[in-house]
Swiss-Prot record:
Keywords: Amino-acid biosynthesis, Aromatic amino acid biosynthesis, Glycosyltransferase, Magnesium, Metal-binding, Transferase, Tryptophan biosynthesis
Name of the protein this chain belongs to: Anthranilate phosphoribosyltransferase
Pathway(s) served: Amino-acid biosynthesis; L-tryptophan biosynthesis; L-tryptophan from chorismate: step 2/5
Encoding gene per record: trpD
Catalytic reactions of this protein: N-(5-phospho-beta-D-ribosyl)anthranilate + diphosphate = 5-phospho-alpha-D-ribose 1-diphosphate + anthranilate
Length: 339
């Protein structure tokens, strides 16, 4: 069965969602060798993934994950693929606290850095959030304070079977795409940044197959895997089973475009300070702007704002009210008390 599937991909034939699910179920059950996994990943990357293949792989990974139950019918995630090489501060992580400050349930899925100096887990750890807590603590945080951090290694133990082939290949594969599609709380409203413009529709279509309610899949034309305030952004919006793709520009929300260097991040401690300054209301410039526009999209996805302009305005109000910073402090205290 594996040889037939591999031959199909080598001959540049797409797999069905079910075929992909079967292969990844075998990977995550330890039924394939490192050589087989490596050959499959390389052949798939050469052919190019489809949205059905992405969805099939994500379904297999979701089944193997440690799941948590969110009490809210609306659950937001702001996890992206990473890999944009932009070395910005942690925009999506900071925006997650703004969304939570609006009273929306946030299950922030993330990991340590892969391609930058500081991933979501790194900055949260620098802020004082305890990462190595049991999954039930994350579940309690999501349900009791409205935001929890789902540290990927604690929820996706089956990924251990892909560690060696991924490391030895050393190139980007489908595994670099699965994180935002495999939230352990089954987040159904997302702002999902991707590392290439051609991926926005593919991810939106995959999210649709996976049952998402509403999502904005975004790629800044400056290369950012976020909604950019330095350049226009390609958006594939999933709403009620339909995907629409369009561009938005910073001028739609703000008077001036920012400079790429305004988005620069640094070490985890430096990025933690940036996040605190934004959430406490001290930061009033481009860094705040990029956070409120990304948080604003999440507020629209969650049904809290009518459109992006209203979402941006609401995100700014939440920061100014102190509610976003309060959510950060609550998460820090909760993980320390329950770790």
């Amino acid at each position: 069965m594996f040889s037939q599937t591999l031959s199909k991909i080598i001959n540049r034939k797409d797999l069905s969602r079910e075929e992909m699910d079967r292969i990844f179920s075998d990977i995550f059950s330890g039924n394939l060798t490192d050589a087989q996994i490596g050959a499959f990943m390389a052949a798939l990357a050469t052919k190019g993934e489809t949205f059905e293949e992405l969805a099939g792989a994500a379904e297999a990974m979701r089944r193997k994950a440690t799941r948590i139950q969110a009490a809210s019918p609306v659950v937001v995630d702001t996890c992206g693929t990473g890999g944009d090489g932009a070395h910005t501060f942690n925009i999506s992580t900071t925006s997650a606290f703004v969304v939570a400050g609006a009273g929306i349930c946030v299950a922030k899925h993330g990991n340590r850095s892969v391609s930058s100096k500081c991933g979501s887990a790194d900055v949260l750890e620098a802020l004082g959030v305890k990462l190595d807590t049991q999954p039930e603590v994350a579940e309690e945080a999501v349900n009791e304070i409205g935001i929890g951090f789902l540290f990927a290694p604690l929820f996706h133990g089956a990924m251990k079977y892909a560690i060696v082939p991924r490391k030895e290949l050393g190139v980007r594969t489908i595994f670099n795409m699965l994180g935002p599609l495999t939230n352990p709380a089954a987040a159904n409203c997302q702002v999902l940044g991707v590392f290439a413009p051609q991926l926005t529709e593919m991810f939106a279509d995959a999210l649709n197959l996976l049952g998402a309610r509403r999502a904005f899949v975004v790629h800044g034309h400056d290369g950012l895997d976020e909604i950019s305030v330095c350049a226009s952004t390609r958006v594939s919006e999933l709403n009620d089973g339909r995907v629409q793709t369009y561009d938005i520009s910073p001028e739609h929300f703000f008077e001036d475009r920012a400079r790429p260097e305004d988005m620069a991040g640094g070490t985890p401690s430096e990025n933690a300070q940036i996040t605190r300054h934004i959430l406490s209301g001290k930061e009033k410039g481009p860094r705040r702007n990029v956070v409120v526009v990304n948080a604003g999209a999440a507020l629209v996805a969650a049904g809290k704002a009518e459109d992006l302009k209203a979402g941006v305005a609401l995100a700014g109000q939440i920061i100014d009210s102190g509610k976003a910073h309060e959510k950060l402090e609550q998460l820090i205290e909760f993980t320390k008390s329950n770790g």
